[in-house]
């Protein structure tokens, strides 16, 4: 039987406890989980690709069937390159579903092997987003409840650098 391989794509700017929750749960469902960190040119990320990969690695080091890859370009092409079984997406709200449903169907039009798997977050993480976390951190609020310790320290470093 072939191994199951799921891709969890995102910009992860920064990785949050909600992301960690989804990857942890996916690691029990799939043989291999690829955390695919998008370069995200259009989003102008706070953290560089290298920083985001490192923060994800530090935050998920307890999981042994997870790998971390930076990527650019179409997700469906990356899906093929990785010989993936499916793509994992988190759904926090109905508005997420509408967008993800459209995206999954578009990707399936590009490659009929494309499959999307949707997970809802654990209740305590359902409201967390990287955007909200960045805004709280920018205003020097306490984000320790929302992100792994490595991210808290990365924000502290950004503040020391004048952010």
From Swiss-Prot:
Recorded catalytic activity of this chain's protein: (R)-4'-phosphopantetheine + ATP + H(+) = 3'-dephospho-CoA + diphosphate
InterPro entries referenced in this protein's UniProt entry, alphabetically: Cyt_trans-like, PPAT, Rossmann-like_a/b/a_fold
Binding site for ATP: 11-12, 19, 90-92, 100, 125-131
GO MF annotations in UniProt: ATP binding; pantetheine-phosphate adenylyltransferase activity
Transmembrane segments: none
Keywords: ATP-binding, Coenzyme A biosynthesis, Cytoplasm, Magnesium, Nucleotide-binding, Nucleotidyltransferase, Transferase
Subcellular location: Cytoplasm
Binding site for substrate: 11, 43, 75, 89
UniProt-annotated site: Transition state stabilizer, residues: 19
Reported cofactor(s): Mg(2+)
Entry's EC annotation: 2.7.7.3
Top-rank taxon, per record: Bacteria
GO process annotations (BP): coenzyme A biosynthetic process
Family (UniProt): Belongs to the bacterial CoaD family.
Summary of the function given for this chain in its UniProt record: Reversibly transfers an adenylyl group from ATP to 4'-phosphopantetheine, yielding dephospho-CoA (dPCoA) and pyrophosphate.
Binding partners and assembly: Homohexamer.
Protein name per Swiss-Prot or TrEMBL: Phosphopantetheine adenylyltransferase
């Amino acid at each position: 039987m072939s191994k199951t391989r799921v891709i969890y794509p995102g910009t992860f700017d920064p990785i949050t406890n909600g992301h960690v929750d989804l990857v942890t749960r996916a690691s029990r469902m799939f043989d291999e989980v690829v955390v695919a960190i998008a370069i995200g040119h259009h989003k102008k990320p706070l953290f560089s690709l290298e920083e985001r990969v490192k923060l994800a690695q530090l935050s998920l080091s307890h999981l042994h069937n997870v790998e971390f890859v930076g990527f650019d370009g179409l997700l469906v092409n990356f899906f093929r390159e990785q010989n993936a079984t499916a793509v994992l997406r988190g759904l926090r709200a109905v508005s997420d579903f509408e967008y993800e449903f459209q995206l999954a169907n578009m990707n399936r039009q590009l490659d009929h092997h494309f499959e999307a798997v949707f997970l809802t977050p654990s209740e305590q993480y359902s409201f967390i987003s990287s955007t909200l976390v960045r805004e709280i951190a920018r205003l020097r609020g306490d984000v320790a409840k929302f992100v792994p310790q490595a991210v808290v320290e990365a924000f502290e470093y950004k503040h020391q650098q004048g952010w």
